[in-house]
């Protein structure tokens, strides 16, 4: 399944993996997974975190290594995000609930994830998703961005 990913996708997932892998040991533990989920405004229980890891933990060592992470991401991309998941993600970014994601809101969420972006990088991300050119991302643009592979 992971063999259907492009090199670009694999590079992106490598970056995402290192956001999760806080101590840089090459594996994601339930503790690290919990930290990232909470920074995204989620509040999973220990049991839910364990379930998430068990779903993809092919070698049964209780952690997720990069190949397992790739499998998980490939699987997630295949059953493309449900409407509800996309709406939920949009709400995480749209801090003030005005129906738009501004550069400041995007920067805030990315910083919470431990991803320090330059203003240029944030502006570039907004530009890529901002179809109508108003300088922010509305829900339709967000859906388009999330569902275009």
Swiss-Prot record:
Residues reported in the UniProt entry to bind Ca(2+) 1: 21, 23, 25, 27, 32
Xref: InterPro entries: CALM/Myosin/TropC-like (IPR050230), EF-hand-dom_pair (IPR011992), EF_Hand_1_Ca_BS (IPR018247), EF_hand_dom (IPR002048)
Binding residues for Ca(2+) 2: 57, 59, 61, 63, 68
Gene Ontology terms: cellular component: myosin II complex
Binding site for Ca(2+) 3: 94, 96, 98, 105
Residues bearing PTM N-acetylalanine: 2
Gene3D superfamilies associated with the record: EF-hand
N6,N6,N6-trimethyllysine: modified positions: 116
Xref: PANTHER family: CALMODULIN LIKE 3, MYOSIN LIGHT CHAIN 1, 3
Stated role: Calmodulin mediates the control of a large number of enzymes, ion channels and other proteins by Ca(2+). Among the enzymes to be stimulated by the calmodulin-Ca(2+) complex are a number of protein kinases and phosphatases.
Note: This protein has four functional calcium-binding sites.
Family note: Belongs to the calmodulin family.
Protein name: Calmodulin
Organism: Pyuridae sp. (Sea squirt)
